[in-house]
Curated annotation (Swiss-Prot):
Sequence positions that bind ATP: G38, P39, S40, G41, S42, G43, K44, S45
Keyword Glycoprotein: no
UniProt membrane topology term: Peripheral membrane protein
Protein name listed in UniProt: Arginine transport ATP-binding protein ArgV
Subunit structure: The complex is probably composed of two ATP-binding proteins (ArgV), two transmembrane proteins (ArgU) and a solute-binding protein (ArgT).
Matches recorded under PROSITE patterns: ABC_TRANSPORTER_1, ABC_TRANSPORTER_2
InterPro entries, per the entry: AAA+_ATPase, ABC_ATPase_HisP-typ, ABC_transporter-like_ATP-bd, ABC_transporter-like_CS, MetN_ABC_transporter-like, P-loop_NTPase
CDD domains, A to Z: ABC_HisP_GlnQ
Principal place of residence: membrane
Length: 254
């Protein structure tokens, strides 16, 4: 059984002639947190979206928990799997976007129980009980019957995290989860993410929050221009980077 939750091997992605990912190798062990950092346009979010086949890779292989994502291999040839099979793979991978993506016409608890009931076929009573547990964990049990428009951005993002966790994923992907928030609301979301990490959730996080990366990440990967420039522990990459490109990026944040 693989000890790697994510194993990306020479992953390439292009849009026409534009190469966005140029042979990415990335390994994320189970139960660890990896933060992807780098300038805008470096390919971080594209890489994240390839992990659950929201973007299709053009070359290379990407495995999650030992399963080839998006394709089936036969006699050395890759065949794209059906959207139904891709959705099944995706149901084991939680994803939290920048902009919350909550259903505006459903209450907080309705947002959380929707997928467990319809995708995982859970009884509504079980889904509701679990949703309330998760809302308690993210500090929003008192908002169960509120609508998204009645919540702050930070509260909406905490609901979005609870909604993703309700599907009992083996992996969580975060695409700049705090970038759309007012600065004073960032901390409440990062605290929820840190709690997830402390609970052993495997996480791949695209972020500009260097303090979070330093405190929570097991591995930091610096990307630029579609390649991995440098990877290692937070101390190695953030405190003592070897590559000039990494040093330039980090100094630009100060």
């Amino acid at each position: 059984m693989s000890q790697l939750m994510i194993d990306a091997q020479q992953v390439c992605k292009n849009y026409g002639r534009l190469e966005v990912l140029k042979g990415i190798d990335l390994q994320v062990p189970k139960g660890t947190v990896t933060c992807l950092i780098g300038p805008s346009g470096s390919g971080k979010s594209t890489m994240l979206r390839c992990v659950n086949h929201l973007e299709k890779v053009n070359a290379g292989r990407l495995y999650v928990d030992g399963d080839l994502i998006g394709y089936r291999e036969r006699d050395g040839v890759l065949y794209e799997i059906s959207e139904k099979d891709a959705a099944k793979q995706r149901s084991d991978i939680g994803m939290v976007f920048q902009n919350f993506n909550l259903f505006p016409h459903r209450t907080v608890i309705e947002n959380i129980i929707e997928a467990p009931i319809h995708v995982k076929k859970q009884p509504e009573s079980k889904a509701r009980a679990r949703a309330m547990e998760l809302l308690e964990q993210v500090g929003l049990a008192h908002k169960a019957d509120a609508y998204p428009v009645q919540l702050s951005g930070g509260q909406q993002q905490r609901v979005a995290i609870a909604r993703a966790v309700a599907m009992e994923p083996k992996l969580m992907l975060f695409d700049e989860p705090t970038s759309a928030l007012d600065p004073e609301l960032v901390g409440e979301v990062l605290r929820v993410m840190k709690q997830l990490a402390d609970d052993g959730m495997t996480m791949l996080v695209v972020t500009h929050e260097m303090g979070f990366a330093h405190e929570v990440a097991d591995q930091v990967v610096f990307m630029a221009d579609g390649v991995v420039v440098e990877a290692g522990t937070p101390e190695q990459v953030l405190d003592n980077p070897k590559e000039q490109r990494t040093k330039d990026f980090l100094s630009s944040l100060l």
